[in-house]
């Protein structure tokens, strides 16, 4: 019904009709799907929460004399240097050198790669320490200096797995606390934690990846970037509702953007007690309304979206595949759910208010003609199986 070119032309002229994924629900209720599909050009989606599989490539530039850094640290957090001379990759979950981790259980994990990234985006100083074995063309063997984002040539966020389409809701059926990436789970199912923006979440508004694909524009902590691939652990073949929405993790996205253009509010270092360090990140993705079906998918409500409740004391770590039940995001967001006759308090690691703020910011940028859409040049696969890691002996021959 509409093309990307037509929608971008309207955006450039500041004539596009843009709604958030929350606003479009009532809009379609009032107008009807056919009329609304003709009027609405873009629906903005967003999420804000922990995204462990995140990091950034950094180019430090050359010192005088030069060094080929083979081992490096930023504020004592190890960086990967197995690439060119002064390039490195900083991972969000990397711990500070000599962090006791879970030696004194549960560990506090006060500082890691995500915190370093937050400091860089804030413009704060970070200490670089690098070592090398020395070569004829790169003779320096050690370097220690202080840097800020402004000193660096490139700082490019490259995240192999963000924006899970859906995710588990976690409980603990054991008699002792369990510390996880979904937070602290109290014994005997006294609480439940989850992590999704539900009806605002990007891939839940495009369940079969019809508009979100390789090359799609994304808003990454305030910086315009793009999807460069399906994410790692992308597992679209899963149990779905009649409308096509997954009840499991399902799809993921690999995204990239210039960290120099990011806004500090939307990129935060995290400490997860008993688990590790991570990064909370804000992501917004616009969905072009190119036909009625795409619009229909964006009108999904929380009561139509379901998460699988998993026991993280046994079934998750042992990979049994057991699901206790499914609960809707409407129930999860109410603050309590009933599981097997027991009322359980719920809490979210994902911030819906921040996600809504991001969706509104992206809506504003598009409405003002400052954020154009990209037509994907590759499709995110919707039929690839997810493989497990077998434990086996070395094959002969």
Residue spans for each PLM region:
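Anaerobic metallocofactor- and corrinoid-dependent redox/one-carbon enzyme cores
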Residues: 2-10, 15-397
């Amino acid at each position: 019904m509409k093309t990307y070119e037509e929608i971008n032309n309207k955006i450039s002229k500041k004539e596009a009709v843009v709604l958030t994924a929350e606003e479009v629900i009532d809009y379609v209720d009032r107008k009807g799907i056919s009329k609304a599909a003709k009027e609405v050009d873009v629906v903005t989606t967003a999420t804000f929460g922990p995204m462990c599989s995140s990091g950034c490539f950094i180019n430090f530039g050359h010192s005088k004399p030069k060094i080929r850094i083979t081992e490096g640290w930023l504020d004592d957090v190890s960086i990967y240097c197995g690439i060119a001379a002064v390039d490195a990759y900083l991972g969000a979950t990397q711990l500070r050198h000599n962090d006791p981790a879970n030696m004194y259980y549960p560990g506090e994990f006060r500082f890691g790669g995500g915190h370093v990234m937050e400091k860089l985006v804030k413009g704060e100083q970070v200490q670089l320490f690098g070592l090398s074995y020395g070569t004829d063309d790169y003779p320096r063997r050690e370097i220690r200096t202080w840097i800020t984002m402004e000193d660096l040539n490139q700082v490019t966020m490259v995240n192999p797995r963000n924006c899970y389409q859906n995710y588990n809701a976690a409980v603990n059926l054991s008699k002792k606390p369990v510390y996880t990436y979904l937070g602290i789970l109290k014994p005997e199912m006294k609480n439940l934690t989850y992590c999704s923006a539900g009806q605002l979440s990007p891939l839940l508004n495009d369940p079969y990846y019809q508009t979100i694909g390789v090359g799609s524009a994304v808003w990454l902590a305030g910086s315009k970037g793009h999807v460069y691939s399906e994410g790692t652990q992308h597992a679209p073949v899963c149990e779905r509702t009649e409308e096509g929405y997954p009840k499991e993790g399902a799809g993921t996205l690999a995204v990239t953007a210039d960290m120099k253009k990011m806004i500090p509010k939307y990129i935060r270092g995290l400490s997860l007690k008993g688990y590790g360090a991570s990064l909370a990140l804000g992501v917004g993705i616009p969905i072009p309304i190119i036909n009625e079906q795409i619009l229909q998918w964006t009108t999904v409500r929380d009561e139509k979206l379901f998460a699988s409740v998993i026991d993280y004391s046994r079934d998750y770590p042992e990979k049994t595949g057991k699901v206790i039940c499914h609960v809707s995001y409407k129930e999860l967001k109410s603050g309590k759910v009933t599981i097997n006759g027991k009322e359980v308090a719920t809490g979210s690691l994902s911030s819906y208010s921040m996600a809504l703020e991001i969706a509104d910011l992206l809506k504003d940028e598009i409405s003002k003609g400052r954020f154009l859409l990209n037509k994907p040049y590759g499709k995110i696969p919707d039929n690839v199986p997810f493989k497990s890691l077998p434990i086996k002996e070395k094959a002969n021959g």
